[in-house]
């Protein structure tokens, strides 16, 4: 990013991105993270150090990259109308890929539940016609899962409140609503961790357990990412970065999209994995 650039003198509305080290550095950081993750799963020597280095490297690269994007929008005013449109399309496509991810998890769950004979029948003991397997003690869907459903539905309401407050140029209500949404996200994650801790089955306890932890755990990771996203928006809102005109509030808009997506996915998980699956 060149601080001496003067985008006002451009003869077009598009953003020609300056050379950046973050894409390639993020790629190497992700490689380190994957190596660390595999090493941790297999118990290799120094696995925790490699995994920690990968997490820190990815976090630093993403922070630095997004910091530059924010500066390009606020300081350099590079986020013109065509650029904002392109960013919105990119975010929509990203959410579409996430839908495909969860679609695969649901397909695996339905394959196992509607026809409970696993492909790895010799490894995982699954009795035909019985779902969930008799060795699995499932969760009561109207205990912690129902509470978590109410938490996420309420958080969807508060993030919408924050959006409307921003549109009305009410910074105080916007910041308050974002703070409530963040607290609800943290509460959800805490309840999910409590549920996992007291679960009667492990990830390796068969096809039901692997499907359950993969789907709900992947969603839980998205809640954590979304909460971090909202925390960044909270501090930016307090600083007065978001407006209703000009460069607008793309960061907040994308965080709200992402959070609503997480809410909808949980409703499907609650309905099919917890209620139908039990």
Swiss-Prot record:
It comes from the Bacteria. Pfam families: COX3. PANTHER family: CYTOCHROME C OXIDASE SUBUNIT 3, CYTOCHROME C OXIDASE SUBUNIT III. Disulfide bonds: none annotated. Keywords: Cell membrane, Membrane, Translocase, Transmembrane, Transmembrane helix. InterPro entries: Cyt_c/ubiquinol_Oxase_su3, Cyt_c_oxase_su3_dom, Cyt_c_oxidase-like_su3, Cyt_c_oxidase_su3-like_sf, Cyt_c_oxidase_su3_a-hlx. It is a multi-pass membrane protein. Its EC number is 7.1.1.9. It is found in: Cell membrane. The chain crosses the membrane at residues 21-41, 46-66, 89-109, 174-194, 212-232, 256-276. Its main location: membrane. This is Probable cytochrome c oxidase subunit 3. GO terms for molecular function: cytochrome-c oxidase activity. It catalyses: 4 Fe(II)-[cytochrome c] + O2 + 8 H(+)(in) = 4 Fe(III)-[cytochrome c] + 2 H2O + 4 H(+)(out). It comes from Rickettsia felis (strain ATCC VR-1525 / URRWXCal2). GO terms for biological process: aerobic electron transport chain.
């Amino acid at each position: 990013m060149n601080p001496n650039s003067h985008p006002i003198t451009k003869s077009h509305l598009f953003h020609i991105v300056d050379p950046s080290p973050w894409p390639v550095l993020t790629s190497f950081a992700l490689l380190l993270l994957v190596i660390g993750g595999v090493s941790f799963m297999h118990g290799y020597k120094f696995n925790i150090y490699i995994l920690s280095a990968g997490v820190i490297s990815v976090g630093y690269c993403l922070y630095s990259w997004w910091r530059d994007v924010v500066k390009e929008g606020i300081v350099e005013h590079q986020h013109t109308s065509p650029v904002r449109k392109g960013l919105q399309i990119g975010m929509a496509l990203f959410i579409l890929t996430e839908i495909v991810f969860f679609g695969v998890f649901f397909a695996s769950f339905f394959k196992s539940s509607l026809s409970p004979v696993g492909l790895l029948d010799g490894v995982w003991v699954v009795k035909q016609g019985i779902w969930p397997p008799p060795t699995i003690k499932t969760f009561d869907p109207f205990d912690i899962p129902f509470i978590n459903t109410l938490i996420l539905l309420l958080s969807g309401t508060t993030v919408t409140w924050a959006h409307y407050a921003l549109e009305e140029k009410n910074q105080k209500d916007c910041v308050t609503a974002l703070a409530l949404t963040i607290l609800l996200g943290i509460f959800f994650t805490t309840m999910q961790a409590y549920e996992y801790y007291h679960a009667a089955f492990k990830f390796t306890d068969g096809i039901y357990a692997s499907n359950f932890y993969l789907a709900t755990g992947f969603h839980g990771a998205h809640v954590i990412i979304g909460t971090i996203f909202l925390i960044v928006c909270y501090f930016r809102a307090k600083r007065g970065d978001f407006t209703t005109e000009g460069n607008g509030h793309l960061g907040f808009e994308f965080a709200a999209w992402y959070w609503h997506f997480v809410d909808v996915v949980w409703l499907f998980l609650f309905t099919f994995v917890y209620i139908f699956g039990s």
